[in-house]
Amino acid sequence: MPAKHTARNSNFTRRPSYYITIFVGLQINGKIEHHTAPNITIDNSEPGDYTLLTALIEIHYLPCIAYFSAVYGADEIQLERCEHYVKQTYRNRCQINSANGKIPLVVPVSSKHGKTLITDVRLDYTQKWINNHWRTLQSAYGNAPFFEHYAPDLHDILFRKVEFLYELNYMLLSMCLGWLEWSMPIKETNIYADRPAINVLDLRFAINAKKLEQCHQFYYPVMYNQVFGNTFVENLSLIDLVFCEGPRASSIVQASAIQKMNK
C-alpha cells in the first residue's frame, strides 16, 4: 500500500462563492443533445494557508468512470474502511460492455450472519469466478486497441487470489490510478465519522448501482470509442475506457467531471 502522507498544517476558511454553468453533450437515443449541467460552486477564497481537499469514498471493485470523476481534483482519496459491507453494491461488482450489452461482473464473497466490516469480507474461491471473469473480459475486450497493453496488470492482480475483498479492491484501485497517471495518495479511515471534517468531500453512497441518476451530480458522460455497436454505453467500469482509449482515458475522465473540487 502507498506510504502515508502528512497533510500540510492549515486552517480551512469559508469564503464567498460564485457559480458557473457548463454545457455538455449527451448521446440520447443515438442523437447528441446539449444539456446544462447543474451550477457548480467555485470557492473564491481569501489568501491563506493551503488546505488539503480529501475525497472520502467507499472502495469498489473495478470502479466505474463516475467514481474517478467524483474524486478528480482532490488532493487525496480517503477510503472508508470502517463501514459495514453492503450487499448488491459496487463493492463486489462492476459493469462492462459486451456483444449483448452491459453485463455485470460479480465477485462472490463468503457470507456471514449479521454485520461484517468491509475489511473482514473474504473472497469465495469455491466458485471459479476469476477464470469466468477473465474469459468474459477476453471475449469482450480482446479486440480492443489497448487490451494487450493493460490487461497483464489486471491479470496479475486477479490471479494472486488474495484473501479479502478489501485487499483486492485496494490493489485494483491503485492499478486504475496508475493507468490514469494520477499521483493521488490513498489514505484510509480509522473511525467511521457521520460528519467528516469541513475539508472532506463525503462521497460515501454517492455512487449507487440502483440509483444511477445520483452520479449526475458530479459526472456527465463524455463519449469515446467503444468496442460494441453504435450506441454509447455510459459509466461502465474504468477498464472499458482504458482498454478502448488507452492514454486518452485520463483526459476523458477529467472532461466528465462536473463538480470541480477547488483547493
Describe each region flagged by the PLM.
Residues 30, 40-44, 48-263:
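Residues lining hydrophobic/aromatic ligand-binding pockets adjacent to catalytic sites
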Residues 18-28:
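Short, composition-biased linear "edge" segments at structural boundaries
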